[in-house]
Amino acid sequence: MATTVVLCSGGLDSSVIAKWAVEELGGRVICLFVDYGQRNAPFERRAAERIAEAVGAEFETVGTFWLRRLCPDNPMFAGRLPREAGTEDLSANWLPARNWNLLGVAAALCDHLYLEGEDDEFHIVWGINAEEAERFPDNTKEFADAVAEALKRGLPSRPRLHSPLAELYKPGIVRLGSELGAPMELSVSCYNPIWEDDTPVHCGECEACYHRKRAFERAGIEDPTEYLE
């Protein structure tokens, strides 16, 4: 039986790739949440856990905090993420080597399970997409292809890297999620979320909420998200 590790941040894309992994790859699926000290980690972790439960996957969480120690003033840690839509830029969202860090943790889990003799076929699924690839170099297909080759060459578990959203923009991701029956309503995109009755509530005003609203609108899919504004 194959084992698949899904990098699950608790966001919209994560809810779609988690469902995709269960439907397309089958076998044992583990949703892996990495807490690297991001300011919304408690909200994101809860969302990731609920997504895993909804799709019938296992859930694992790992803490890795060297990024926060190296970059303490980064907006991801310092609480200065843009409040209003239209104020976002690369400096507000770029965390040095974050995707390397996340992929490394997923790869380490694959190797651990391989060395324990639990499986001999491994997959890693992550949610890079075409929209973010236009701004972030570690979200491009070229980067993913290079990492996929490195994983095969550098690890005894030889995990295969899957990027099912790499050629999709947000509306396409929403459509795919709808087709799969992904639990998008459980995901958290907001920079300033709150929880009410174990349900994520989005502020409706930040850049992330703007992109989320627009994605559902352009996809022609009813938005299940609860917004304050």
Curated annotation (Swiss-Prot):
Belongs to the QueC family. Zn(2+) binds at residues 190, 203, 206, 209. The keyword Hydrolase does not apply. Pathway: Purine metabolism; 7-cyano-7-deazaguanine biosynthesis. Its EC number is 6.3.4.20. The keyword tRNA-binding does not apply. SUPFAM superfamilies: Adenine nucleotide alpha hydrolases-like (SSF52402). It holds the Pfam family QueC. ATP binds at residues 8-18. HAMAP family: QueC. This is 7-cyano-7-deazaguanine synthase. It is an enzyme of class 6 (ligase).
